[in-house]
């Protein structure tokens, strides 16, 4: 049964299968039909790093599939405070559950967990590295709003150095051949040259631009991230860049009529709240999609579909 640790663990066919399954789940919910795909299964949720939306949506997803859930939140709530290693924690959870969902502040922690565990591991965010289920949610919403994922123009805006959501989103896009992807970030938040080269080597038509204003008339999708304050090694560096960009309603009005704006949330001050009431806002669609997409991912990883 497959892990979902890196978005590149999934090929295009896998992603489309998850999207189609999520659509079926939404249809079932609309018609009050229950799907107990994980009945008599146990899903362990190890959330060492703080989380609200991701943890709650995984809990709800597992419960809607009729699974039992075991939730460990924060280092203080686990045996880590007693000195237990991540290795031992994963070993224990692997013996009493069928799937492990892990969120951790260390890059590569989910990959490590998958090497320790015999059962499937799903990465709910590991440091600044990746957040694969969020990228599935993001692409699911784009697909739903745009009727497909191919041949679109994207702008990815904000913290492109530390935001794992942006990193996973860009890697996921490599599967769908967008027409172009514009990266817009303050100098200190630009992606590394190594990551840019990786994206280009996978065929992504990616361009760094200084101003969103210069490309917004041609863009179909804008993906915005907050500045990841908690990931800065030096707090004074965060102070220099906080508030350095904002997507305003006036700026959005300069784009296409069917332009959509995504944001993985939470937001701080980088996204104008006036956009919320316009057809451009797709970020609350992302919240709504989080449960069906994560239900589909859990079922796929468990091998029941």
UniProtKB/Swiss-Prot annotation:
L-aspartate binds at residues 82, 164, 226. One of its GO terms (molecular function) is aspartate carbamoyltransferase activity. Keywords: Pyrimidine biosynthesis, Transferase. Pathway: Pyrimidine metabolism; UMP biosynthesis via de novo pathway; (S)-dihydroorotate from bicarbonate: step 2/3. It holds the Pfam family OTCace_N. It comes from the Archaea. Carbamoyl phosphate binds at residues 53-54, 103, 131, 134, 265-266. The keyword Secreted does not apply. GO terms for biological process: 'de novo' pyrimidine nucleobase biosynthetic process; 'de novo' UMP biosynthetic process; amino acid metabolic process. Its EC number is 2.1.3.2. It catalyses: carbamoyl phosphate + L-aspartate = N-carbamoyl-L-aspartate + phosphate + H(+). Catalyzes the condensation of carbamoyl phosphate and aspartate to form carbamoyl aspartate and inorganic phosphate, the committed step in the de novo pyrimidine nucleotide biosynthesis pathway. Belongs to the aspartate/ornithine carbamoyltransferase superfamily. ATCase family. HAMAP family: Asp_carb_tr (MF_00001). Heterooligomer of catalytic and regulatory chains. This is Aspartate carbamoyltransferase catalytic subunit. The gene is pyrB.
């Amino acid at each position: 049964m497959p892990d979902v640790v890196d978005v590149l663990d999934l090929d295009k066919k896998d992603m489309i299968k998850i999207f189609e399954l999520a659509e079926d789940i939404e249809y079932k919910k609309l018609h009050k039909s229950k799907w107990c795909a994980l009945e008599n299964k146990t899903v362990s949720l190890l959330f060492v790093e703080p989380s609200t939306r991701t943890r709650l949506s995984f809990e709800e997803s597992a419960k809607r599939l009729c699974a039992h859930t075991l939730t460990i939140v924060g280092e203080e709530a686990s045996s880590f405070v007693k000195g237990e290693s991540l290795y031992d924690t994963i070993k224990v959870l692997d013996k009493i559950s069928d799937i492990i969902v892990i969120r951790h502040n260390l890059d590569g922690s989910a990959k490590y967990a998958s090497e320790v565990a015999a059962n499937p591991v799903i990465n709910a965010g590991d440091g600044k590295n990746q957040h694969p289920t969020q990228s599935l949610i993001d692409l699911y919403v784009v697909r739903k709003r745009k009727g497909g994922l191919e041949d679109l123009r994207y702008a990815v805006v904000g913290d492109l150095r530390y935001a794992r959501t942006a990193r996973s989103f860009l890697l996921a896009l490599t599967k769908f051949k967008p027409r172009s992807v514009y990266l817009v970030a303050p100098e200190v938040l630009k992606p590394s040259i190594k990551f840019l080269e990786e994206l280009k080597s996978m065929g992504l038509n990616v361009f760094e631009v200084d101003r969103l204003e210069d490309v917004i008339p041609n863009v179909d999708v804008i993906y915005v991230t907050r500045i990841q304050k908690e990931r800065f090694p030096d707090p004074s560096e965060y102070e220099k860049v906080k508030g350095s960009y904002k997507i305003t309603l006036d700026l959005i009005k300069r784009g296409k009529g069917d332009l959509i704006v995504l944001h993985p949330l939470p937001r701080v001050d980088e996204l104008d709240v006036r956009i919320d009431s316009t057809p451009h806002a797709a970020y609350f669609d992302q919240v709504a999609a989080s449960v069906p997409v994560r239900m589909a991912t859990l079922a796929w990883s468990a091998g029941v579909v």
